Amino acid sequence: MRLHVLRPTRQHLHRHGAPRVQPLGMRPPRWQRWSVHASVLALLATGALWLVVHFLLRAPSGDGLPHPLEPWALRLHGIAAYVFIAVLGSMSAVHIVLGWRARRNRGSGGSFVAAALLLALSALALYYGPESTHAPTSVLHWVVGLALLPLLWLHIVIARRRARI
């Protein structure tokens, strides 16, 4: 079974007024590409901010309390995560399905989606899981989170090289 996704063109209309359609390409629209890039960068920035504030900065009072920026870094990171999940969901409707069925860039795209799912699951485990699993889950979340941007970059580079061939 072949999936056909069609988009109206601005060319002439058929004789009955129905718009002509052309196949939708593999490349997502600009708003989706920018949304993915912006949300991944926001996740990386807020996650890195939390790591710096949590491990390198202490509260000015010196009583061992977390730095005042720490909860704000987590809040912003959570907001960025919700945006990223929404954007990834919008990508799954066309780009991910078409790419998977066309067997194009499965390794890089699948790795990116797997990393995103692992991040979502580890975030849930950090929020709702037992304290005994918090430290290893946290390290897993950092490592996979720091790998998300290189995975996205790799997926884009592979797709662009393949498009030139």
Q: What function would you assign to each model-found segment?
A:
Residues 2-165:
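Membrane-embedded alpha-helical bundles that constitute the cytochrome b-like, heme-associated redox core
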